[in-house]
Regions:
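Signature aromatic-anchored transmembrane alpha helix within multi-pass, membrane-resident enzymes
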Residues: 1-9, 138-141, 190, 232-240, ...
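Transmembrane-helix signature of polytopic, membrane-embedded enzymes
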Residues: 2-4, 128-150, 167-168, 177, ...
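Multi-pass, polyprenyl lipid-linked donor-dependent membrane glycosyltransferases
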Residues: 28, 113-123, 142-172, 177, ...
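Hydrophobic/aromatic-rich transmembrane helices and adjacent perimembrane loops
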Residues: 33-34, 163, 198-200, 204, ...
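Interfacial juxtamembrane loops and adjacent helix segments
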Residues: 42-97, 101-106, 265
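Membrane-lumen/periplasm interface segments of multi-pass, membrane-embedded glycan/lipid transferases
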Residues: 72, 76, 225-228, 243, ...
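Hydrophobic, aromatic-rich transmembrane alpha-helices
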Residues: 123-129, 282-308, 347-350
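Membrane-embedded, lumen/periplasm-facing catalytic core of multi-pass transferases
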Residues: 370-419, 447, 511-512
Length: 512
């Protein structure tokens, strides 16, 4: 019966991920992961045929363009100019999720990459059930329900980002590390290796698991040392691959696509971030989340210590990080939020049993069901189930460009640069990467190379474009667009300005 119930919970989350999935390559993160998945798939495909190819391909226009810092203007959303291959681009995001997506791309094309999301969501729920079952089978099942209903899980499982995959891998690593089976330390280390590849900055979580294995009280010292050493060796490949990849992409094993550590981290951020993360945790998961703090008294032991220490380490890693104001950045704590939810269920169950309350199973189950309903309601009040509709503009605009613009179109855009490349296969140029004095000359340059320039904006970007290029007639953007898509995206043809001034411009095409 519990197996059927768990399958139902897993299936519900998977269906949610598919039904409401915002499976578009549009934003910075999503295009970063999906585009790199295409590159890794290309590398794997060539290797399977006994050939070698590189992850970085130089863009000829970036090599030849005459304006300052030209490479930056040809780096689409989610990418930066490569410091190691002139004229190429590199992702800002870690390689782990893209590598996981690559086999799906090989099997079913670029859009198949999105199917890793429900799979990782299923792994997250299943692993939570296993870890929770260390406190009892009932706790395992009920905690998996809470995780599947968590607002931040629901918000992230429908997006092509690494948060749910990272959480799934860390929970699976904990599930294996807390197992009594002979090869559990080895398997936990291998999963940790994958988790590090997915989110390299969370290496300290792996150290926490290693210390748990080293200090596990129910085992002898030889067993502890053997388990910890096995775990450490199995975790090492992920660290090595990260170092090699980052060295190839950014010129150093310790560099990343997000920028310098000095720019990203400061102790001055700690207070602001502490209030934000704890506040978001409370507002999304109700005051019940505080019950996890009672676990050391009601459920003393290694598993409780592991869960709380991992959460504190996860929190500490992000306290000095850049301050964000949107609740969705609670996703940074997603790898360990399931551990808190397990402790919440375990504390309720243990408290009822300690006070010998009749009907413990029914009361605990009812409490968790109520919490789950509150969680889902909270997720609905946030834009969780509207993301698919809100981000559909990326796909619609990209498809329009592919269907209606000529093959030699070069699209000057910014936030839509990834979607134009992914759905239309057209070259892009970032207007906010151009020197303000170079817009007109950039248009002349791309025409001289055989490309027809188009301008594509989200409506909110038009004012910024005008302000950036006040000295250019094209920069005024004072003629109607050739097309408006989903009432949010506009496409302009620079040549249409003269037609408009002479009264010969055809009307704007409105695309729903």
């Amino acid at each position: 019966m519990r197996g059927f119930a768990l399958a139902l919970v897993i299936g519900s989350l998977a269906v949610t991920a598919v039904r409401w999935g915002s499976w578009v390559a549009g934003g910075s993160d999503s295009y970063c992961y999906v585009h790199q998945a295409e590159r890794w798939a290309d590398v794997f495909g060539h290797l399977a045929r006994g050939r070698l190819t590189g992850l970085q391909l130089a863009e000829p226009l970036a090599l030849d363009a005459p304006w300052p810092d030209a490479a930056r203007a040809f780096a689409p959303s989610g990418h930066v100019p490569s410091p190691t291959v002139t004229g190429a681009i590199v992702p800002i995001c870690p390689a782990g999720l893209s590598i996981a997506m690559a086999p799906f791309v090989l099997a079913g094309g670029p859009r198949a990459a999105f199917y890793v999301l429900p799979l990782f969501g299923a792994v997250l729920v299943a692993a939570t059930s296993v870890v929770g079952s260390r406190f009892g089978a009932r706790v395992g099942l009920l905690s998996s329900l809470l995780v599947a209903a968590s607002p931040i899980v629901l918000y992230q499982v429908i997006q092509p980002m690494s948060d749910v995959p990272a959480a799934a891998l860390w929970m699976l690593a904990v599930a294996l590390a807390t197992s009594a089976k002979p090869r559990s330390s080895l398997l936990s280390g291998l999963v940790t290796s994958a988790a590090i590849l997915m989110r390299p900055n969370l290496v300290p979580l792996g150290i926490t698991i290693g210390l748990f294995l080293l200090l596990r009280p129910e085992r002898s010292w030889p067993q502890r040392l053997r388990s910890a050493a096995t775990y450490a060796m199995a975790s090492a490949p992920g660290c090595i691959v990260v170092a090699l990849t980052q060295n190839a992409f950014y010129g150093s094993p310790f560099a990343s696509g997000y920028g310098s550590l000095v720019a990203l981290f400061s102790l001055s951020y700690v207070t602001a971030n502490l209030g934000r993360y704890l506040g978001w945790l409370w507002s999304t998961h109700t005051a019940a989340i505080v019950l996890a703090l009672l676990a050391p008294w009601l459920l003393p032991g290694g598993l409780t210590a592991l869960a709380l220490v991992m959460f504190l380490v996860n929190l500490a890693l992000y306290l000095p990080y850049v301050v964000f104001d949107d609740w969705s950045y609670l996703r940074f704590l997603l790898p360990t939020i399931p551990l808190l939810l397990i402790l919440v269920v375990a504390v309720v169950d243990a408290a009822l049993r300690r006070f010998r309350v009749p009907g413990v199973a029914w009361i605990t189950s009812a409490a968790v069901i109520v919490l789950s309903v509150l969680f889902v309601r909270e997720a609905r009040q946030r834009p969780t189930f509207a993301l698919k509709r809100l981000e559909a503009r990326f796909e619609r605009a990209g498809i329009f460009v592919g269907d209606r613009l000529p093959p030699n179109a070069l699209v000057i855009t910014s936030s839509e640069s990834g979607s134009v490349r992914f759905y239309a296969g057209r070259k892009t140029l970032l207007w906010d990467g151009l020197d303000p004095a170079w817009l007109d000359r950039a248009l002349m340059y791309v025409r001289s190379k055989g490309y027809e320039p188009y301008l594509l904006f989200e409506r909110r970007e038009e004012t910024d474009f005008r302000q950036r290029f006040p000295g250019s007639a094209i920069g005024r953007l004072d003629w109607p667009p050739m097309a408006e898509i989903a009432a949010q995206v506009r496409i302009y043809r620079p040549e249409d300005r003269d037609r408009y001034l002479h009264g010969t411009l055809p009307p704007t095409e409105f695309v729903p």
